[in-house]
Amino acid sequence: MNSLRIARAALRVRPTAVRAPLQRRGYAEAVADKIKLSLSLPHQAIYKSQDVVQVNIPAVSGEMGVLANHVPSIEQLKPGLVEVIEESGSNKQYFLSGGFAVVQPGSKLSINAVEGYALEDFSAEAVRAQIAEAQKIVSGGGSQQDIAEAQVELEVLESLQAVLK
């Protein structure tokens, strides 16, 4: 019962406290137009808290562009293209097989992925050949485990093929 009285006392507002002027933040302050990107794979860090202008990610909820001062969120990534627009204006593209992106307050973006490679490292012909192999296994050429693994492989390869076109 004692704690209830303390809570009620905390709700009472003294008239002098209400009359105190509120300080407002001015809009003349410079707004940061960069986002600090960390893009990490198990074997390397591609970006280590580097300033970039924009990052486009393939979230499960839909394609998403992340700019400075973006709303904080956590996104699961599907296999697809991550596009990084750097300060110099250059555009770097990476294919990730999946992972997570965390947009944090203070214009910070952390992307963690199991696999990721520069898009230029892929061969469209090799991807087509691997898709054909995976399709053979999915259509009944192996155990249930082999078929399940081939289905996952096929999903990733088809996403990669769509990006390479």
UniProtKB/Swiss-Prot annotation:
Compartments it resides in: Mitochondrion; Mitochondrion inner membrane
Any one of the GO CC terms: mitochondrial inner membrane
Protein name: ATP synthase subunit delta, mitochondrial
Hydrolase in keyword set: no
Gene of this entry: des
Cross-referenced InterPro entries: ATP_synth_F1_dsu/esu, ATP_synth_F1_dsu/esu_N, ATPD_C_fung, ATPsynth_dsu/esu_N
Subcellular location, principal: mitochondrion
UniProtKB keywords: ATP synthesis, CF(1), Hydrogen ion transport, Ion transport, Membrane, Mitochondrion, Mitochondrion inner membrane, Transit peptide, Transport
Quaternary structure, from the entry: F-type ATPases have 2 components, CF(1) - the catalytic core - and CF(0) - the membrane proton channel. CF(1) has five subunits: alpha(3), beta(3), gamma(1), delta(1), epsilon(1). CF(0) has three main subunits: a, b and c.
GO biological process: one example: proton motive force-driven ATP synthesis
Task of the protein: Mitochondrial membrane ATP synthase (F(1)F(0) ATP synthase or Complex V) produces ATP from ADP in the presence of a proton gradient across the membrane which is generated by electron transport complexes of the respiratory chain. F-type ATPases consist of two structural domains, F(1) - containing the extramembraneous catalytic core, and F(0) - containing the membrane proton channel, linked together by a central stalk and a peripheral stalk. During catalysis, ATP turnover in the catalytic domain of F(1) is coupled via a rotary mechanism of the central stalk subunits to proton translocation.
A GO MF label: ATP hydrolysis activity
The organelle targeting sequence, given as a residue range: 1-27
Stored Gene3D superfamilies: 6.10.140.880, F0F1 ATP synthase delta/epsilon subunit, N-terminal
Family recorded in the similarity comment: Belongs to the ATPase epsilon chain family.
